[in-house]
């Protein structure tokens, strides 16, 4: 793990003096980016105790303004990267209206970053149902109670909605709300970044072409 060191500066508001040493490491380039991601993700799970599957998801609105937030990756395979959400949330509305998104993983203990770009598609109902039933009951209730991204007057209003849902489904399974499902980001571009000394980082991008992947190094 890198230790961040900040050189004393006359202003505590400045962070440009913060530096971290990097482990020199030559990156092997497998032909399949999903395989490469899977190997890195296994290392991240060993190195990061809390939420190694955290990622930034960026979408764009009708006005062209991007929005980004941290969510949890719930599944990935050759088809793409899956997360779940309320489809009436801001990210849900934007992903449906403009079905492209960007993801970013940053695993600081590994000196690794992965960026994913691609088309967004909805997961199947069977996939969404299976994942929803694996969630804690409180999270299932919350999926019904929360009008995600809508204005909320008081915390008590939310708690009252939670109580109503709990009463409605007392003693029985909580079904998946029709507005709650998953999105799969189908990648057409995946970039791997590995930190090196003097900011001469390793960057390799995979571009989907003719049903396969073409790799290309990039200047840091």
Swiss-Prot record:
Alphabetically ordered keywords of this record: Flavoprotein, FMN, Oxidoreductase, Pyridoxine biosynthesis
Record has Transmembrane helix as a keyword: no
Pathway this chain belongs to: Cofactor metabolism; pyridoxal 5'-phosphate salvage; pyridoxal 5'-phosphate from pyridoxamine 5'-phosphate: step 1/1; Cofactor metabolism; pyridoxal 5'-phosphate salvage; pyridoxal 5'-phosphate from pyridoxine 5'-phosphate: step 1/1
Needed co-factor(s): FMN
Binding positions for substrate per the UniProt entry: 74, 131, 135, 139, 199-201
Gene Ontology biological-process annotations: pyridoxine biosynthetic process
UniProt enzyme class: oxidoreductase
Catalytic activity from the UniProt record: pyridoxamine 5'-phosphate + O2 + H2O = pyridoxal 5'-phosphate + H2O2 + NH4(+); pyridoxine 5'-phosphate + O2 = pyridoxal 5'-phosphate + H2O2
Listed EC numbers: 1.4.3.5
GO molecular function annotations of the record: FMN binding; pyridoxamine phosphate oxidase activity
Binding residues annotated for FMN, in chain numbering: 69-74, 84-85, 90-91, 113, 148-149, 193, 203
InterPro entries attached to this UniProt entry: Pyridox_Oxase, Pyridox_Oxase_CS, Pyridox_Oxase_N, Pyridoxamine_oxidase_dimer_C, Split_barrel_FMN-bd
Pfam families cross-referenced by the UniProt entry: PNP_phzG_C (PF10590), PNPOx_N (PF01243)
Keyword check for Flavoprotein: yes
Cofactor note: Binds 1 FMN per subunit.
Function: Catalyzes the oxidation of either pyridoxine 5'-phosphate (PNP) or pyridoxamine 5'-phosphate (PMP) into pyridoxal 5'-phosphate (PLP).
Subunit composition and interactions: Homodimer.
PANTHER family per record: PYRIDOXINE-5'-PHOSPHATE OXIDASE (PTHR10851:SF0), PYRIDOXINE-5-PHOSPHATE OXIDASE (PTHR10851)
Family (UniProt): Belongs to the pyridoxamine 5'-phosphate oxidase family.
HAMAP family according to UniProt: PdxH
Protein name according to UniProt: Pyridoxine/pyridoxamine 5'-phosphate oxidase
């Amino acid at each position: 793990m890198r230790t961040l060191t900040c050189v004393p500066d006359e202003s505590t508001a400045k962070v440009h003096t913060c530096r971290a040493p990097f482990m020199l490491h030559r990156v092997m380039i497998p032909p399949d980016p999903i395989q490469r991601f899977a190997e890195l993700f296994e290392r991240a799970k060993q190195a990061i105790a809390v939420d190694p599957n955290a990622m930034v998801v960026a979408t764009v609105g009708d006005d062209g303004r991007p929005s980004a937030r941290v969510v949890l990756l719930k599944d990935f395979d050759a088809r793409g990267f899956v997360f779940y959400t309320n489809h009436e949330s801001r990210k849900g509305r934007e992903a449906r209206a403009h079905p492209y998104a960007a993801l970013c993983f940053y695993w600081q203990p590994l000196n690794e970053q992965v960026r994913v770009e691609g088309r967004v598609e909805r997961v199947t109902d069977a996939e969404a149902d299976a994942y929803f039933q694996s969630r804690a009951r409180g999270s299932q209730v919350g999926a019904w109670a929360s009008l995600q991204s809508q204005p909320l007057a008081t915390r008590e209003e939310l708690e009252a909605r939670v109580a109503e849902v709990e009463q409605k489904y007392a003693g029985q399974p909580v079904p998946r709300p029709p507005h709650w499902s998953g999105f799969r980001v189908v990648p057409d571009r995946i970039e791997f970044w590995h930190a090196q000394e003097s900011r001469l980082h390793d960057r390799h991008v995979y571009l989907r072409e003719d049903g396969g992947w073409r790799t290309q190094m990039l200047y840091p």
